[in-house]
């Protein structure tokens, strides 16, 4: 009889009580062909430890928030001090003001900000606000860009087709997504066609300025600036979903790198230091439409709770220190350069790229441009799954999906990066 690991046992038990055994689908490891996920016991610095005491170099970082590494001493101390004063008040607290001021200081395109509990809440609220502000209903999103699981976002276009949205999850009525239009990332022609057809009906464009849910795809040929221009020409709002990229690719987010000013920005992940949080913010004249200042309703029992606010304040204080982002970027660049050199040495079809503390792995030649969701079909997903399994078995924890970006933290050491490169080199050599 096969001896089962504690993770296998826990997964079997979890499936009796939790649909699919997990509380977010990608965690089940099904997309990478694994029979069971690893159940984590604790984490510290750059490492995860599972319930079988296996140690992993973690390149997920809780899907982005752990930019300082797990259990940063200063963040933990701040949280522990706040815990003694209460977990949640259901009333305003000073920490909300302090975190709002810090975000606005670091992202000057945001003049006012509202805190929520997740990235999904942030994008959902931003869309509602944009519709109310413009008195229009239709929105444009991009194929392959993920903005949470609100009904209006669970839409995909046909292959290369421009069409009215069709829901791609059961339970989402067609009437809910009939006003969601889908375009192709990095393709201005698809955007122009939608504006020609629905010119006075489009409330906003929502976009990941760097598409981190298509692995990691950068905007090409001034794509973001062109989105800004077409929104201005048609009195539509531009929303940057920086839940993933905010305070991760740069201190001022992707908008500071590309020098494009959105009307609204959504945030999450890093601003909570590992605690559940989200936020949306932007121009004051727009944000003043949010209740109780204006008529657009948004509320939440745990919004702005003092624990998440405290963790966020300390995290942003630390990542604001001079030189930290230079060091973070150097770590990611060392990893990416090492992986690319290893692949080149063995003529292996692979390339990686990075920006700030975020990176993407593509299992195809660097001569193949991957600039759209359709382009991802050119990559070898089966080979990624094999790579994932090999790295996991050897103590490296990567995102369990070829469509997800990876994250590095300030806690990753040169030794961690070198071990990762050495393992990848061996895989490239053997495959």
Curated annotation (Swiss-Prot):
Its main location: cytoplasm. Pathway: Porphyrin-containing compound metabolism; protoporphyrin-IX biosynthesis; 5-aminolevulinate from L-glutamyl-tRNA(Glu): step 2/2. Its cofactor is pyridoxal 5'-phosphate. It catalyses: (S)-4-amino-5-oxopentanoate = 5-aminolevulinate. Pfam families: Aminotran_3. InterPro entries: 4pyrrol_synth_GluAld_NH2Trfase, Aminotrans_3, Aminotrans_3_PPA_site, PyrdxlP-dep_Trfase, PyrdxlP-dep_Trfase_major, PyrdxlP-dep_Trfase_small. GO terms for molecular function: glutamate-1-semialdehyde 2,1-aminomutase activity; pyridoxal phosphate binding; transaminase activity. One of its GO terms (cellular component) is cytoplasm. This is Glutamate-1-semialdehyde 2,1-aminomutase. The lineage of its organism: Bacteria, Pseudomonadati, Pseudomonadota, Gammaproteobacteria, Thiotrichales.
